[in-house]
Amino acid sequence: DNGSLRALHPLKARLLTESVLMKSLSQWVRNNGIISYDTLRTREELNSDQTPCVANFDFDVTAASYLNPLLRFSRAGEIRPGFFVCDMLLGCKLSLVHLQPFITKCRSINSLRNSPRCLFMFIADEYSEEAFLEMKRAGIIPATPEKLFGKDVADALFQLRDLVGSITLSLKDNIAAIDDIMSKLANIAGATNQLQGDLFEYIVAETVRIDSKDVEVGKICKSLKGET
């Protein structure tokens, strides 16, 4: 159980951080007119009909785009939009081994005869030089949270991942850390409401800590009957 818990916390932290990042990215591509507003889909869509998919390949984020370099025209003269597509993986420096599946996916789409033109992007904290250069050669944007959204947002995402990834609340001044995270991410549409729920257990834990020094979060508790 302890082994599963140790594996679960970093995964939960990464998925939560990437969820906030997807909201920020969605807001950014909409506000900058890169995509057709209502066509955006993310991997968090519960409706299977709205899965982010292009040419039968799944991505974390997709949206139709009417940017001129991405447009195509049918024989009848009808406009065929291109697509903005993005995958992301936070939490470590990515090597070419990590990114090769994404590169292959993008090249496969480009090789298909009737596939739409795409603007490909990958977001990670850091890339190896080999991975960065190979992404550029493949026509993919190797982005980072800091380059896209600035240092404050990138720092807040790191703080969030660090906080949620801790099995025990060993960090000092967690309430201040949570407040700092919320302040830095306040301008991302939907992020504040999401974090109020996701960080609720941490806020409660800090309150309980007043009377009890030994506090753990994220543990699955069971009754004597084995019920969770």
What label would you give each PLM region?
Residues 2-15, 70-75, 163-174:
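Short N-terminal signal/transit or membrane-insertion segments
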Residues 48-110, 208, 227-228:
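Conserved catalytic cores of phosphodiester-cleaving nucleases, focusing on short active-site segments
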Residues 120-122, 194:
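A generic secondary-structure micro-motif detector
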Residues 78-117, 124-184:
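Charged, structured surface patches that assemble and position nucleic-acid processing machinery
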Residues 3-68, 180-226:
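Acidic-basic catalytic patches of nuclease active cores, encompassing PD-(D/E)XK
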